[in-house]
Each structure stands twice: as structure tokens, then as C-alpha cells.
């Protein structure tokens, strides 16, 4: 396929984007809005953003969700701007500097919250800055300006959502159904690999792939939840299926690890059962039936605990999977599974990374302010706005540098494209609403094609072009103003890029160490006799951290294996029959305190001291378990955990 070719699957979204832009433009001018450009720009960004992220037409609900986030972010930003202006209107420089800090603060929060919701916080940061900069000459018009911006943005979002509904958005339900079947077959094949106890690299690749697919399925669940209220029951089942899928991975990998020291635990009966190849979910269903009969015949005590747990989790997976596909009423048996355990949310391991993002955004905005005041350039405010936009949106993404490059390419492409519209097309079409709408529809259509291909600069070109062409009411054509706006965008993007290059993000290794220590803390916290604490489901949070670790350190198998071993230790100790008495309960609290000190330690020396203390306490704990005659189901996992911590002590304590 050629570089400028148009694929059939890209046409529908391109038409959808063109329709959203035309609707926003028509409504903006029909109702005599002062700046219809904001409505058009909002419609374009809300519609095109999810398509750029997805690399194609987004699924149903994605545009609506992004629109809601934009509304929330805009309102938060407007309220913050009003508070800042009312408090500091007599000190304009201080007011702008506080806005720069606010933009940095919002970027800091957006780096800590879920990535799906980070857009709202990033937007609220630069919205306040836009308002404060725009009203510099007429501060008394702030409330009116904020209200106009909010209303025009809501109109733009409404147009994007309406266009999405008009062109029958894709439902993700069929993809979810197919992935559920495929995932169960892959889980069975992973257990086959683990029982064969073959090549460790093959097993690592298999479970790593399943972790990614389970994370992707959780993302599909979020999309399905946004799509329609009729999928509420399916959404509840999919939440439980996420935990079950992670449980299956954990039990399979533990089966592999057990065979390193005690291969005789896996009997020939189960080895023969798992030798049967499976291709479809029906094959897996038949095999599970056979296994349940064998377990009933041999008895639970004669069945390895990992296999027993795996068969139970796979059976529950099958039951809930049928419910998701049919979307029928939840049965009593399903309700029992769904009411299982409260899911625990884990604290973010990226606090240092978030602080780097805060300084990058704050410093780049302050640098833009100084540049504006020093040069007195009429479009310095435009450069400042672009700095805030780029840094606020780029920081949350895995590669901020590439996002900046995308914006630079986009603003450079917007200069000749905007020039064509400003000098030729708009002056000749402004007397006819039909021709004006058609001219912008053509722009939206062709950029919509490129956005779906994730063409570098396409998203930036769409936003930058709409931002600099004259779409105000009334239209005024001042070439110097157009050139200033276009150059301001380019300079702003370049200044943001320079700051990102200068303020290096060296938090990667620290984040990795914090993540590994959080795995250790989770394993230690599982040693408890508290009934409420034992019922807490930390598995989704732990695998979410493992997924982050895999993204931060691709190909670093020792780190992944260590993290997975800690997850296995957590699950095994959580279910272990620890003797209930006051002596052990007090010591459990001491172990948790020491593990927390390891995570929060500010220096390597403190961390090593607390980690050494934790190892000593674990040795004492093993002695206490011997005194209280704890069963092997408790002593073996604790011994295995202590051995792992001794082995990887340097990796867990050194920065």
C-alpha cells in the first residue's frame, strides 16, 4: 500500500471526523458564537485523538468518554483560572507564574492517576493558562470568557459525539467474545508447557504474552463499559474474569517452579491428561471435565494444590465466559463468584517520575513567560499556550520526546496548509456557508485518513491548522497576526522540546526498584491471620505493576521472574493455614512495618539497613513457625520467599 493510499477501513472514520468538524462550524456560526474556532478545534481533537491512539477507527464509547474527560478538565481549569485571577489580579506576573505552577501540578497528578483519566488533568492545567493569558488586556471579562470557552467546548464535544453516533460506531463486544475463548486456550497451553517443564525461555514468553493479553482484555472491558448501559452484567463478569485469568497464570507458573525442587508432586496421571493437545475452547471444556472426574476419584489431598486451584479457576472462567457471551441474567452461582473478594488498589510507583514531569511542565511554562516578556513578541502568548499544551499532554505518555517531535512536525506542516486556507480558500468561501463547510470537510477527511495511520505530525497538523486559520466571528484577515500565530506555535513546541531534552528523566531505575520492593511488601503482607486482610484481592494490582515493569524494562527477564515469584509467594501465603495466635499476629505487624520502611527509605544506606532487618525478622519468623508447629503449606513458601530475598538483595536495595 502506497504512502498516500486510502484503505477502505479508513474511509468511515474520515467521513465521521469531517462531519464532526462541519457540524461544529455550522452551529458556531449559526448561533453567532464569538470564537467558533474553539468548537471546531474541540470536535476535531475529541474525534481524532482516540483514532490516533487506536491506530484506526475507535470503538464505540471511546469518543464519548474522551469528550466527558475534556468537559471535566475544562471546568476544573476554568474554576482554577477564576480563583487565580480573583486572588492575584493586582500582580499580573505573579498570576502567570502561579498558572505555570498550576499546569505543572496538574501534570503531576495526571502522572499518578489511571492513564485513561489523565487527559482531564492535563487539560485543566493548560486551560487555566489559556484563560489567564487571553484576558491580560481585559481582566474584567474573565467570567464571560470562561463561560464562552466552556459553552463552545461543550458544543464541539456534542458535535463529535453526534457524528460518532450517526456513523454506527464499531462495537467491541465481538472482539471481547473471541478473545475470551482464545485466552482460555492459551492458558491451557501455558499449563501444558509448565507441566512438561521444558525450556524456561519458552515458558517466560508464554506467560509474558498472557499477562499482556489479560491487560488488553481489561482495556476492552473499559471500552465495553463506555459503549452502552446494556453491558453492565457483562462488565461485572469481565472484572471477575480478569482476576481468574491472572490466577490461572500464577498457578501455572507456580507449577513450573515447584518442579524445580519437587518434580514428583505432579503425578503421571496429570502429566498424561495435559499431553492431549487442544485447539478450541470446546477441547479445553472436555479436558476440564476429565480432570474434575480424576480429582474426585483421586481426592483433593492427592492432587497438587496448584493443579486443584487451576482447574477450579478454569471452571469458573468457563461459567462466566458463557455469561459474557450471552449477556443473560446473573445466576446465583455466578453471583457467588462475583461477590468473592474486594479488589485492592496499589499506590503508584511513579512518584519520582511524576515529580520530573511537574518540573518539566513548570519550567517550560516559566521559560515561555520569560521569553514572552523579554522579547515583547505579540505572539509570545501563543508560544506559551503551545508549551503548556505539549508538556501537559506529552508527559503522561511513554515517550514524551516523540510527542514533542509529532507536535513540531504538525506545526511546521500547518504553516503552508494554514497559508493556503488563510490566503486562498477561506476568503473565497466565507460568503457561502456551504463552501466553507465543504473546504473544512476536505481538510478533516484527508487528515482523518492520516491520523488512523498514526502518521507522524498528523494529529499536530490537524489541531495547529484549525487553530491558526480565521474561524472567528466576525472574520478578520490580518496576515501579520496569522504569521505570528503560526510562528508562535512552532517556537512554543521547540521550547517545550528543549526543556524535555534538558530536564532528563532518570527515574526509570528508581521506579523499577520501587516496583520490586512493592512486590516484596505484598508477599510479606500476605503473612497474616487477619480474616479481612486475607480476603483482600491484590492480584489485579500486582499484575498491573508487573505489566508496568514489563513496559519499563522490555526484555529484562530476571526482573520479570523475580516479580512473578513474589506474586506467587503472595498468593500461596495468602491461602496458607497460618496458626492463629497473638505472638504471630504481633510479628506479622512488625514484618509489614519493616517492609514499608524498605519502600519509603530515602537513601540506599537506609534501604539496605531496613532490608537486612527484614531478612533477620524472616529468619526469626521461620523459627516461630517451627515452635508453633506450622504445617509445610506455610513453612515452605516462607522459606522459598526468604531464599529469594537473600538471592536478590542487591537488586532490591541498590538504586
Curated annotation (Swiss-Prot):
Query: One Pfam family this chain carries?
Result: FUSC
Note whether Heme occurs among the keywords.
no
Membrane topology field: Multi-pass membrane protein
Sequence intervals crossing the membrane: 13-33, 38-58, 69-89, 93-113, 121-141, 152-172, 370-390, 407-427, 431-451, 459-479, 482-502
PANTHER family tied to this protein: MULTIDRUG RESISTANCE PROTEIN MDTO, P-HYDROXYBENZOIC ACID EFFLUX PUMP SUBUNIT-RELATED
| Similarity field | Belongs to the aromatic acid exporter ArAE (TC 2.A.85) family.
The name on file for this protein is p-hydroxybenzoic acid efflux pump subunit AaeB
Organism of origin is Salmonella enteritidis PT4 (strain P125109)
Lineage of producing organism: Bacteria, Pseudomonadati, Pseudomonadota, Gammaproteobacteria, Enterobacterales
Amino acid at each position: 500500500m502506497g504512502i498516500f493510499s486510502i484503505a477502505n477501513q479508513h474511509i468511515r472514520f474520515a467521513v465521521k471526523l469531517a462531519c464532526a468538524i462541519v457540524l461544529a462550524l455550522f452551529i458556531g456560526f449559526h448561533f453567532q458564537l464569538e470564537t467558533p474556532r474553539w468548537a471546531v478545534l474541540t470536535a476535531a481533537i475529541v474525534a481524532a485523538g482516540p483514532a490516533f491512539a487506536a491506530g484506526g477507527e475507535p470503538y464505540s464509547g471511546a469518543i464519548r468518554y474522551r469528550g466527558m474527560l475534556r468537559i471535566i478538565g475544562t471546568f476544573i481549569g476554568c474554576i482554577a483560572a477564576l480563583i487565580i485571577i480573583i486572588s492575584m489580579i493586582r500582580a499580573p506576573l505573579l498570576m502567570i507564574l502561579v498558572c505555570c505552577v498550576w499546569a505543572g501540578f496538574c501534570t503531576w497528578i495526571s502522572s499518578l492517576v489511571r492513564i485513561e483519566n489523565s487527559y482531564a488533568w492535563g487539560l485543566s492545567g493548560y486551560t487555566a493558562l489559556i484563560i489567564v493569558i487571553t484576558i491580560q488586556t481585559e481582566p474584567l471579562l474573565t467570567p464571560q470568557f470562561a463561560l464562552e470557552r466552556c459553552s463552545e467546548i461543550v458544543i464541539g464535544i456534542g458535535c463529535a459525539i453526534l457524528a460518532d453516533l450517526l456513523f454506527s460506531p464499531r462495537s467491541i463486544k465481538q472482539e471481547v467474545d473471541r478473545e475470551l475463548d482464545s485466552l482460555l486456550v492459551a492458558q491451557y497451553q501455558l499449563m501444558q508447557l509448565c507441566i512438561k517443564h521444558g525450556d524456561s525461555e519458552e515458558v517466560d514468553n508464554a506467560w509474558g504474552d498472557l499477562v499482556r493479553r489479560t491487560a488488553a482484555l481489561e482495556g476492552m472491558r473499559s471500552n465495553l463499559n463506555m459503549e452502552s448501559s446494556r453491558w453492565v452484567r457483562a462488565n461485572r463478569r469481565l472484572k471477575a474474569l480478569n482476576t481468574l485469568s491472572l490466577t490461572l497464570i500464577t498457578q501455572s507458573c507456580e507449577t513450573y517452579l515447584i518442579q524445580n525442587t519437587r518434580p514428583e508432586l505432579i503425578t503421571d496421571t496429570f502429566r498424561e491428561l495435559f499431553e492431549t493437545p487442544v485447539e478450541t475452547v470446546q477441547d479445553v471444556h472436555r479436558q476440564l471435565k476429565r480432570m474434575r472426574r480424576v480429582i474426585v476419584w483421586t481426592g483433593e489431598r492427592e492432587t497438587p494444590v496448584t493443579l486443584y486451584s487451576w482447574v477450579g479457576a478454569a471452571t469458573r472462567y468457563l461459567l462466566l465466559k458463557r455469561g459474557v457471551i450471552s449477556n443473560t441474567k446473573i445466576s446465583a452461582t455466578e453471583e457467588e463468584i462475583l461477590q468473592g473478594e474486594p479488589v485492592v488498589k496499589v499506590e503508584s510507583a511513579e512518584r519520582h517520575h511524576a515529580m520530573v514531569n511537574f518540573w518539566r511542565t513548570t519550567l517550560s511554562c516559566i521559560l515561555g513567560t520569560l521569553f514572552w516578556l523579554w522579547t515583547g513578541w505579540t505572539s509570545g502568548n501563543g508560544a506559551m499556550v503551545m508549551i503548556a499544551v505539549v508538556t501537559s499532554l506529552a508527559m503522561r505518555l511513554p515517550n514524551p520526546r516523540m510527542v514533542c517531535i509529532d507536535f513540531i512536525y504538525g506545526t511546521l506542516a500547518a504553516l503552508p496548509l494554514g497559508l493556503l486556507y488563510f490566503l486562498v480558500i477561506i476568503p473565497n468561501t466565507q460568503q457561502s456557508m456551504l463552501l466553507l463547510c465543504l473546504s473544512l470537510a476536505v481538510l478533516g477527511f484527508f487528515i482523518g485518513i492520516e491520523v488512523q495511520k498514526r502518521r507522524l505530525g498528523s494529529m499536530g497538523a490537524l489541531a495547529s491548522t484549525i487553530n491558526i486559520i480565521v474561524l472567528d466571528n466576525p472574520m478578520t484577515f490580518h496576515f501579520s497576526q496569522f504569521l505570528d500565530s503560526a510562528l508562535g506555535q512552532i517556537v512554543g513546541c521547540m521550547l517545550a522540546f528543549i526543556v524535555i531534552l534538558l530536564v532528563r528523566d532518570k527515574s526509570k531505575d528508581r521506579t523499577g526498584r520501587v516496583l520490586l520492593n512493592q512486590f516484596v511488601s505484598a508477599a510479606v503482607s500476605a503473612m497474616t491471620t487477619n480474616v479481612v486482610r486475607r480476603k483482600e484481592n491484590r492480584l489485579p494490582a500486582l499484575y498491573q505493576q508487573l505489566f508496568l515493569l514489563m513496559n519499563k524494562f522490555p526484555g529484562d527477564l530476571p526482573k520479570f521472574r523475580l516479580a512473578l515469584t513474589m506474586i506467587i509467594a503472595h498468593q500461596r501465603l495468602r491461602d496458607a493455614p497460618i496458626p492463629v495466635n497473638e505472638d504471630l499476629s504481633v510479628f506479622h505487624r512488625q514484618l509489614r512495618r519493616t517492609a514499608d520502611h524498605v519502600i519509603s527509605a530515602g537513601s540506599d544506606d537506609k534501604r539496605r539497613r531496613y532490608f537486612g532487618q527484614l531478612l533477620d525478622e524472616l529468619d526469626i519468623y521461620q523459627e516461630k513457625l517451627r515452635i508453633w508447629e506450622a504445617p509445610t503449606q506455610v513453612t515452605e513458601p516462607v522459606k522459598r520467599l526468604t531464599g529469594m530475598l537473600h538471592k536478590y538483595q542487591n537488586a532490591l536495595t541498590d538504586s
